Amino acid sequence: MKKTIIVMPVANEENTMQGVLNEILALPYDNLYIYPVIDNFSKDRTEEIIRNTALRSEKVKLIFYRESNGVISCYLEGFRQALKDGAEFIIEMDGGGSHLPKEIPQFIEKLEEGYDCVFGSRFMKNGNVSNLPFYRRVLSSGGTILANFVLGTHLADMTSGFEAFRRDILERMNLDHFLSTGHMYQTEMRYYCRNFHTIEVPIHYIGGTSSLKFKSVTEALRILFQLKKHEKQIFIQ
């Protein structure tokens, strides 16, 4: 398997962090690495847990991103570090237990088959969502329908954060020019990748305690109608 790095922003995940790291490290891959990205927002023992695990395993590398302005900037900083360290495959996933480590192999398999981007879907056949408030399900599924209509895409899930990319796809993007700083980032990424060789795979999503604020919804709608115009600033000529 080509060198694969998992990028996962984490903050205040002391109750789940060790379990997630252990599950990933138990996967049967010699060339799979974990890059948890943490910032000043995290106030509990999450950083300590990661550092202790990194002392025991060279496959774990903590990235402390002091310039972070939110989870999306941590994702993008993780991508930069993964590219710098020679990753051929980059996987993005949640570090708090919402995404299941046991589903990582299907992303690797599809990249090895030649796909450029692999997107996890909660809403396609065999996908599933649990422990998520009804209004969040409606917003996610309704947001997917609206995004597909406005952007001309045809995906079952436009807002999932479990996804994977070949190195050259991320290298072609200006990672400093994404519009989104919140939930809309996933939709923005899928839109930019629509003309590459992509595929969706079913995932099981376990909801957490985070809430979705009205401001996030209005920001998402604003950005949605700017993406087509903004796209030319993303790809490096």
For the regions a protein language model found, what residue spans apply to each?
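Acidic helix N-cap motif at the loop->helix transition within catalytic regions
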Residues: 15-19, 44-53
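Acceptor/aglycone-binding surface of glycosyltransferases and processive sugar-polymer synthases
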Residues: 65-84, 89, 101-179, 183, ...
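Hydrophobic helical membrane-anchoring modules
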Residues: 1-3, 15, 22, 152, ...
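Active-site beta-to-alpha loop of glycosyltransferases that engages the nucleotide-sugar donor
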Residues: 8-22, 41
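Short, acidic, metal-binding catalytic loop of nucleotide-sugar glycosyltransferases
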Residues: 22-32
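Residue-level signature of catalytic and energy-coupling elements of molecular machines
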Residues: 17, 24, 78, 96, ...
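A conserved acidic beta->alpha catalytic loop
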Residues: 39-48, 97
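Short beta-strand/loop segment that forms part of the nucleotide-sugar
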Residues: 8, 32-42, 63, 93
